[in-house]
Curated annotation (Swiss-Prot):
<protein>
    <recommendedName>
        <fullName>Putative L(+)-tartrate dehydratase subunit alpha</fullName>
        <ecNumber>4.2.1.32</ecNumber>
    </recommendedName>
</protein>
<feature type="binding site">
    <location>
        <position position="60"/>
    </location>
    <ligand>
        <name>iron-sulfur cluster</name>
    </ligand>
</feature>
<keyword id="KW-0408">Iron</keyword>
<keyword id="KW-0479">Metal-binding</keyword>
<comment type="subunit">
    <text>Tetramer of two alpha and two beta subunits.</text>
</comment>
<dbReference type="GO" id="GO:0004333">
    <property type="term" value="F:fumarate hydratase activity"/>
</dbReference>
<dbReference type="GO" id="GO:0005829">
    <property type="term" value="C:cytosol"/>
</dbReference>
<dbReference type="GO" id="GO:0006099">
    <property type="term" value="P:tricarboxylic acid cycle"/>
</dbReference>
<dbReference type="GO" id="GO:0046872">
    <property type="term" value="F:metal ion binding"/>
</dbReference>
<feature type="binding site">
    <location>
        <position position="269"/>
    </location>
    <ligand>
        <name>iron-sulfur cluster</name>
    </ligand>
</feature>
<dbReference type="Pfam" id="PF05681">
    <property type="entry name" value="Fumerase"/>
</dbReference>
<comment type="similarity">
    <text>Belongs to the class-I fumarase family.</text>
</comment>
<keyword id="KW-0456">Lyase</keyword>
<keyword id="KW-0411">Iron-sulfur</keyword>
<dbReference type="GO" id="GO:0051539">
    <property type="term" value="F:4 iron, 4 sulfur cluster binding"/>
</dbReference>
<dbReference type="InterPro" id="IPR051208">
    <property type="entry name" value="Class-I_Fumarase/Tartrate_DH"/>
</dbReference>
<keyword id="KW-0004">4Fe-4S</keyword>
Amino acid sequence: MKISDVVVELFREAAIYLPEDVKNALEEAYKKESSEISKNTLKAIIENNKIAEETQVPLCQDTGVPIVFLKIGKNINSSEIMKIIEEIKEGVKKATEEVPLRPNVVHPLTRENFKTNVGLNSPFINIEFDESLDREIEIIAFPKGAGSENMSALKMLKPSDGIEGIKNFVLETIANAGGKPCPPIVVGIGIGGTADVALKLAKKALLRKIGERHRDKEIANLEKELLEKINSLGIGAMGLGGDITALDVFIEIAGCHTASLPVGICIQCWADRRAIKRIKLDAKL
């Protein structure tokens, strides 16, 4: 199977099927929710997902912008990497037509629609190298809707603001977002690096499965504390008030300048869509 065909199937899977961990988290949220209106909203979300699977149509009308996380193993040369990138672009074009995906990607100033979700650096491909893979690549399709993406935030805190400053910024951001990102949400937080790195870490944090804690115990405890505090805000499903505002909180960190404390926040809606595939490359790509 060509890489472009794999990309089509990954975006089809991501658009139609929620990952099992997300489905289970929504079911748990439904059981725990005490607000009748939020409980009914969660019930509607769960039923919506079943209908999407049965009818093979995307589970949300906003099929997002196409984001790809690409891991490249060893023994893959630069010309092969360029070929892989072209195959990913071709796959996004085909997926837009075949799944179908809504053609969301437009010119930022003229608002001209590219019709294919490909153009001006889209799809957005994040590349990293992994020596544990030998002539293998890993592709994660990660469609991202506008409602949650528009609630992203970045703040360059003072180092003296410390952990309390980070907590306050996160809670202020979620409180101000309210129902706009279509809760129950998943919250990705990037701490450290530079401004751009913090936001990239926050986006990457959203790739984790619900319940998957950070390997550093201190960070893991901060994730749990923030989840509890966010759910105490009472925003509830779709902002209608309730116990469950977030399904999980994930944090990623990086070293930063001694005079900086960047914090990036990326929010994912209840439709926490992602699909992953590893591919062993042929002798000649």
